[in-house]
Structure formats: structure tokens, C-alpha cells
Amino acid sequence: MAVVVVNSATASLLAVCLVFMAVGLCTGQIVDVKFPSCRCERELTPFAIKSAATQLTSRNPGVVNLYCFEIGIVNSGSGACYTEPASQNLSKVSVYAQAAQRDRLSAFGVLLAGAPVSNMTYLTPRWDSLNMTTISNLNFSKTQANGTRICLELFKPTTINEFCEREGASGSFCWVALFNDNNCVPPNSTVVISKRLCCPRFQSFLSP
């Protein structure tokens, strides 16, 4: 069993989930959370987060833990967020985090598919007021994104179970959202959006 993608449009999300299940990317509990807090469509794009997160050896094992989410590709889908040219690149990744844990995040890591952990690129995390921590300007094609890992470097003894926000839901998982654009227009903003913004989100569980 893997993950579920959810918002208030439960029927639509269940349909999306069935597509993900076909490639081993979707399962779990149907819940709704206030993430991401952006005016964007939480529908299927060519990109997904695999359900099993992993812990890798960190660059400083005595000080930090390293937890990673792997990007997968959905090879069959429909709808504007899947088919439009603007959705064929992955621009941004966000993780839903607990406000009290902000100072526990040392860095984001990006590990390209097939590369050794020693080749990890470390980036300074960016936060917004809605408990999203984000890396942007990725501009990954499907080929570049497939198998790439997005990692959280957390100061010990913090684990991703403690770091991630679940809004009271049971289970040990993180919410991760994938965006086709760097922008996050707040839900109540009256700004006119000139392109379709897509932001499916996924639950990813730490493997034993």
C-alpha cells in the first residue's frame, strides 16, 4: 500500500488515486489537509512522490539525520494538469512541516537518480507563513526528475515523524507537494493567474 492525494473534491482525487495505484504510487487514508495553501489545482501531473521514504547516511552522522522522498513518473494520465506543456516540468517541491520544528531543518538535499550520496547537492530551505518548506527553481524534465530524491537534513534527534505536519491524522508520514511553477498565490488573493498552476500532494512513509 502506498499513498493518497486529497482535497475537498474527494471523487476527483479518488480517480487520481486509482491512476497512481496502477504505478504503485497511491494508497492509504483519504484525509484533507490545508496543504499546500496556494491557489493551484491538486490534480494529476506527470510527477509523483513514491510512498516509501528512506533514510540515508548523512554527511555528518553525529549531528544530522537524512530522510529522502523519491520522485516517480506517471506514464499515463489525462486532464489539463497532466497534458498541458506547462506541466511537463517540475519546478518546486514543498513539505508540510510543524511550526515548532522549523529550526530543526538544516538543509534540503537533491540527489539525482543513480548518483552516490556523496554527490548530494545541499540547498538552504525556504519557509512561508503556512508551514511549508520549499525548494524551487528545479525545472526538472520527466527524465531528470525520475528517480531523483528530495531530502530533508534534520538536526538530531528529530525524525521526519516529528518534523512533518499531519493535522492530527494517524500514521507516520509526510505530505509532499509537487508544483509546475515557482509561484504560490495565497488562497484569498485576488491576483489574476495567467497560467494553470498544478500542485498534487502525496503521503510518503518512512520505510522500516
Swiss-Prot record:
Glycans are attached at residues 89, 119, 131, 139, 146, 188. Keywords: Glycoprotein, Signal. Pfam families: DUF3707. It comes from the Eukaryota. Residues 1-11 form the signal peptide. The sexual inducer is a glycoprotein synthesized and released by sexual males at about the time they release sperm packets. It is one of the most potent biological effector molecules known: it exhibits full effectiveness in converting asexually growing males and females to the sexual pathway at about 10(-7) m. This is Sexual inducer glycoprotein.
